[in-house]
Design a protein with these regions (language model features):
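Extended, compositionally biased eukaryotic interaction scaffolds
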Residues: 79, 110-116
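Extended, hydrophobic/aromatic-rich amphipathic alpha-helical segments that build helical scaffolds
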Residues: 82, 86-89
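Structural recognition of alpha-solenoid helical scaffolds
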Residues: 47-50, 62, 66-69, 92, ...
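Extended acidic/polar regulatory tracts at the flanks of large eukaryotic scaffold/adaptor proteins
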Residues: 2-67, 81, 117-204
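Elongated alpha-helical scaffolds that mediate protein-protein interactions in large eukaryotic proteins
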Residues: 40, 60, 95-106
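Alpha-helical solenoid repeat architecture
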Residues: 90-95, 134-138
Length: 204
């Protein structure tokens, strides 16, 4: 009940958020803007889960709209904004299923995801680069192997091979962090699951 109340409060708070551009953003874009605001010192779990719910409920072009907006924030100059966006991306991947997985598996998305990666790996990756490498490694070992639609996710495997060829080293993914992407896992939308997600995001 507490998690549901928090998400309802987030919906009320951000549903009328003004636009910072000339165009009026969609409800989904306003939520993503709120989730990735540089004023946030840590991920807002309630807003992140509300975004996942919006993607699932609206369907249609919502997965593509969300993936495009999120990857733009991942490339933000402010590393805190980029890390917030990566945390949001993780929530969406683990809660939105195939329609969203299909978007992150496109060549366009993956090229944008690694746009700030130099041709030669740095001696030590930045926190943002490390989180991106971790995400790609996690996707390769989970949805690219266990999803019934894994044949549609070949570009993720291709990107993993390309980065490995260039010399990038992928971190080991914690089993409990990746387990939620297994088909047999229960929903992560219970209060207990919300706490687990929040603890995971605080490690970013």
């Amino acid at each position: 009940m507490e998690a549901a109340s928090a998400r309802a409060a987030a919906r009320d708070r951000w549903s009328d958020m003004p636009s910072s551009s000339g165009r009026t953003p969609s409800q989904l874009q306003r939520f993503i803007q709120a989730a990735c605001s540089p004023e946030n010192y840590e991920p807002n779990l309630a807003v992140n889960l509300e975004i996942a719910d919006l993607i699932n409920s609206k369907k249609g072009t919502a997965p593509r709209e969300a993936a495009t907006a999120i990857v733009n924030y991942i490339n933000h100059r402010n590393p805190n904004v980029a890390l917030l966006a990566l945390g949001l991306l993780d929530i969406c991947v683990k809660n939105c299923g195939y329609p969203f997985h299909l978007q992150i598996g496109t060549k366009e998305f993956l090229n944008e995801l690694v746009r700030r990666f130099p041709e030669r790996p740095p001696m030590r990756p930045t926190r943002v680069q490390a989180k991106i490498l971790e995400a790609i490694e996690e996707w390769r070992g989970t949805i690219c192997e266990t999803s019934r639609y894994k044949e549609d996710l070949g570009f993720i495997r291709d990107m993993h091979r390309l980065l490995s060829y260039k010399g990038y080293v992928f971190p080991e993914v914690r089993r409990e962090d990746a387990a939620v992407l297994n088909p047999s896992d229960v929903s992560w939308k219970s209060p207990e699951s919300c706490v687990s997600i929040l603890n995971m995001l605080r490690r970013t």
